């Protein structure tokens, strides 16, 4: 009987440790930085530096991806415009339908952090 109880306690301890590690992995994966999210979701079109020259930006597209480093263009946008574009895609702000919506992919916090990164890239505040 004692051996059976010790075996159950050992199994319970292993499950508890594995659960802790699984929770830590999930938390760190969900807490991607704005830079990581930009590289993963945005750089394909906007480029790693944000200049609109990513590998998916081709001359065949009806519009070019926005150059996020252009203060002249980016300062025309409010923070709300940027958040809406990221959340609902390009059509939400009467821009390219090629810009997909990320509102169901990224959290509000991640979208807000991306907006902050875009403001850093353009070195501007917006209107």
Regions found by a protein language model. Name each.
Residues 64-74:
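Short microdomains enriched in Cys/His and/or Lys/Arg
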Residues 13-23:
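Bacterial N-terminal signal peptides
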Residues 22-37:
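Electrostatic cytochrome c docking/interface patches
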Residues 1-8:
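N-terminal secretory signal peptides that target proteins for export/translocation
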Residues 77:
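Residue-level signal for the nucleotide or nucleotide-sugar donor/cofactor binding architecture
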Residues 64-66, 81, 85-112:
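Axial heme c-ligation environment in periplasmic c-type cytochrome domains
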Residues 35-62, 88-97, 121-127:
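Periplasmic/extracellular electron-transfer cofactor-ligation site
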């Amino acid at each position: 009987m004692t051996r059976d109880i010790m075996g159950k306690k050992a199994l319970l301890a292993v499950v508890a440790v594995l659960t802790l590690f699984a929770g830590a992995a999930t938390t760190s994966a969900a807490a991607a930085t704005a830079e990581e999210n930009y590289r993963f979701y945005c750089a394909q079109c906007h480029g790693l530096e944000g200049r609109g020259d990513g590998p998916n930006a081709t001359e065949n597209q009806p519009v070019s991806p926005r150059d996020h480093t252009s203060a002249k263009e980016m300062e025309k946008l409010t923070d709300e415009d940027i958040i809406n574009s990221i959340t609902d895609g390009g059509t939400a702000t009467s821009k390219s339908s090629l810009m997909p919506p990320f509102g169901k992919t990224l959290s509000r916090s991640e979208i807000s952090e991306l907006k902050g990164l875009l403001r850093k890239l353009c070195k501007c505040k917006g209107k």
